[in-house]
Each structure stands twice: as C-alpha cells, then as structure tokens.
Amino acid sequence: MNKKNLHTFHVPVMGLAFTIDTPVRISKYGINSVISIVDDALMEKMREYYCRKSEIPYDPISDKAEDYRAKRITAYLNLIDKIVKYEFEEFKNLALEDSSGLEKYIDMLPEDSKLKLSYKKFTKKNNSKEELKRWIQKNLTAGNADVNIMTKVDKENYYKNEKLPVEYNDAHAALRGFAKSNLNSSLILSAGLNPRLYSYIEKFEDFYPNENGQLKKKIILKVSDYRSAIIQGKFLAKKGLWVSEYRIESGLNCGGHAFASDGYLMGPILEEFRTQKETLIQTTFDILSLSLKNKNRLCPDLPMDVKITAQGGVGTYEEHQFLLDYYQLDSIGWGTPFLLSVRFV
C-alpha cells in the first residue's frame, strides 16, 4: 500500500544502534524512522530482548547456521513489524475509551494537515462511538519502519576457509534479510553505487509494481547531489527498479559526521533538484518502462510517486519550513535532536 506521509519530518538512521528499535516507540504516531541492518548480532540480541518483553517464544539463530545473517535480519524485522502492528491496534482501540492518545496523535501533525483539519471538523459533531471507530480505521496510519544498508559495507565471507558466493556478502545478505521480511516499507541505500548489490535487488518480487501500480517494498537513494541521483536512478531503472525517494544528505553538516565532497552547500544542490525533478522522473520512467516490458512485467502507464527529501544541519522550525516551501521537499530528516529524547532512541 502506498501512503502519503502524515508528517513533514522523519527520523533518519543514527549509527548502528540509536534507532535500532525506534519504530516500536513512535510508529503508532504515524512517524517514519529508519533501522540500520548492518549489525546482525545486535539485531539478534534485540530480538531476544523484545521476545522476552512481549512474551513471544524466542528461537535463537546461531552464527553457525547457514545464511544466519539474512535469517537474523528477517526474524528481527518480522518481530518489529508484528510489535508495531499490535501496538498500533492497541492504540486505536484505546482511543475509543480515552481520547488523550488520539489527541496527542493529532496534535503532533502539522497545522495545515488535512487529517488534523478533518479531525477538528469531525469532533464538532456529536458522533457515536461507532462513527469514531470508523473514522479512526479510515484515517490513522502507522509510521514506516524503513531500513538502511551502507552499500559499500559488503565484506566477503568465508566458511571453512572457502569464500562463499557473492550473495553471502554482508550487504547482499542484509538486502535478502529485508526482502524476505513482512515489512511494507523502504530500503534506503547509502554510501554510493554498488552495481552488484543493485543488480541483486532484481531477484526480489516485492520491489516490482503490482497490478495496481503499487510497491510493497520501495527504494530510497541517499545522495549528495543531483548527478549522483540521476546516475543511480537510471542504473536501477535499467533493472526494472523504481526509486521512490531521493534523500539528499548534507556532506558538510549531518549529525557530527562529514564525508568527502566538493564543498557545495545544500542550497544550490536542492535548487537543482527543484528545477530538474520532472526531468529526473521522466528520464528514469522511460528507462523503467522499457525494462519492465522486456521482462514481461506489469508497467504503470504513468510514473509512480517520487519524493524529494533532505536531512542534515537543520536547526530551527523556520529552516524546516523554508526547505519545505521553497525547495518543495516532502520531508526533512531530524536526527540529532531526537538523540536527546529517550522516547525516540
């Protein structure tokens, strides 16, 4: 199911562990967040912790098991999906008896949110409990539990001194772990183009559009500039894969880390995306259409949704709103402020 973001911000991936369970904490409020799926040992420990906490049977996956890395990642993501869905259903049921949680959900939405305006209009009437239940079921959605893979963290692995096939490389196994999970969310690819890894995505059905032109699993590219976006977008389109979001991250100022760039500031980079967005979409869609037809796959008549988002160095509400309004962005990533909140990380 494709859905529009309720919020104009998202919680980016932070390190290997800071956002490892953030969806459990905030997805019920409709907020998207990102889990790093690099460290399978950490995810296995977290799975044990949440199984114990939720009184769910825990079946350990040993690091001696075949394909243990992918299996651990799938198992942890399936648990996150299960807990988030359960928590969200509990949240909606509780809202029928006590409106404080629902009020909090609505209060956190932007002032111009269509959902917030709909709720205000709805509450002006003397509605029955059954009408409230229908409104909640129709309008409230949980936030996504997206995942992040650093494409260059793709170490080769060995078993009894023999090199395993490429699909057992670290990033390949992480991708497989997500692809086989129950999550209906996005794979965020960061750290640049990895042709072998990108080609491997072709093997998984969830990344292709269904008969309704919808994607169960989407691809988000984390990029530093427009050139990187169109090169990677075209590469994936040739494989029949659609990029649903280009997430621009500042190379100079993002959560205390910096990476090599030519020193371009975010303003000129975002301006190029603002002026070239339609070109980016149409160019990649033309390539995608040909590829899907050659694969005898369903191909939408029109381009699927594409979001342009940004993160890094945003410090005030005014800056946030300026980025949304002037550069026409869909969402802004706020990372560092949430490190101060135990409710998020």
Stretches found by the model and what they are:
Residues 166-167, 175, 181-195, 204-207, ...:
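Core catalytic machinery and nucleic-acid-binding channels of phosphodiester-processing enzymes
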Residues 1-197:
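Long, compositionally biased, glycine/small-hydrophobic-enriched stretches that function as flexible linkers
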Residues 151-159, 181-183, 213-214, 258-272:
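Gly-rich Lys/Arg/Thr-decorated short loops/hinges at beta-loop-alpha junctions or inter-strand turns
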Residues 46, 50, 54, 84, ...:
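Structural signal for hydrophobic packing residues in well-ordered secondary-structure cores
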Residues 221-345:
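Glycine-rich phosphate/ribose-binding loops and adjacent secondary-structure elements
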Residues 110-122, 142-144, 170-180, 210-232, ...:
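Charged, low-complexity, helix/coiled-coil-prone segments
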